[in-house]
Amino acid sequence: FASAAISGGDETTPISFSLSRCNFVEGANTIAVEMHQSDATSSDLSFNLQLLGNIGGGTPVISRGPYLQSGSQTSITIRWRTNVACNGRVEVGTVLGAYTIAGPDESCPTTEHSVTITGLVPDTKYYYQVSATDGTVLQGDADNYFRTNPPENTTRKIRVVAFGDCGRGNSAYQDDNLANYRNYLATNGIDAPDAWILLGDNAYNSGTDVEYTNNFFGIYGNNILKNHKLYPAPGNHDYGNSSANKASRSMPYHSIFTVPQNGEAGGVPSNYQNFYSYDVGNIHFLSLDSYGTEADLTSMLPAGSSTLKTW
C-alpha cells in the first residue's frame, strides 16, 4: 500500500488506507508499518494507528473518478473510488446506453477500483458505464466516453494536451485555466484530445492522497477526467516536495495512476512505472521521471529496439 511523506501543516492530517477483506486471512493477521524521519537530525516523530472495520452495508457512491488510464488502440483501464467497498464492473459500447462489451468483474470488494477492457477497435469512440456487480449503476452518461488510440497509419490530426503544475491548490487559478481549455474544445468542436499528458506536480503541496482528492480530482473529476485518456509523470510535489524521498516508489502517486509500462500501448516494455512509453497514431511518447533517483537509470530506459515512428 502506498505510503506518504508529509511535513509542516500536513502532519496533522491523518493518512488513511482502505484494505479489502481479501487482504486478510482467517485467524491472526499482522499489519506492518515502517516510518522514517526525513533526515538524521529530525526529532519530532510520532505515530498512532487506528483500525476500523466495516461489516458491509450502504449503497456505493463514487468518491473519485472515474478516470481513464493506459489507453491503447485496443484496450483501456478505468479506475474509480467508492465510499464503501463493492465489486466493480465496467461495460462499454459504441452507442450511449447500449453496452455490448464488459470487462472482468472485480473478484474482491474494494473501494479502489480498476477494470481493464480489451478487444476494442482502434480509433473508435466508446461510451462506458461504471457499476457495482449487484446492478447498482454508479455512473454512465453522455460525458462518460473515450476514443481508442488511432493506428500508426492514420492520416488524421493527432491532438495532445499537456498540463503542468495542474494541482497547485489554487482553485481560482485552476478553474480559470480549465474554463479556457474547455471553451477551446467547445469552440473548435473537439470532444477530447487523443492524449492528456501530466508533466508533474499534480497535487500540491506534498502529493498526499488528500491533496490529490482536493487539488486534482476535485478540480477535474466532474469534467475532463471522465473522457480524457491520461498519461501522467511525477514532479517534486508528487514526491512530498522533499529531496529525501527521491528514491521512494511508494508515494500516493504510484498507487493512484496506472501506466502502460508493459508495452501494451506500443513501444518497448519498461516494467517500471516512472519510465514508460506509448504510441498515439504515428507518434511515440516517452514519459520520464526527472525528479526521482534510480540506482541504474539505463535499465529503466527503452533498449532502442522499438519501431521508429514519424514523430
List PLM regions with ranges.
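Metal-dependent phosphoester/phosphodiester hydrolase catalytic core
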Residues: 58-311
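An acidic-aromatic loop/edge-strand motif
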Residues: 3-57
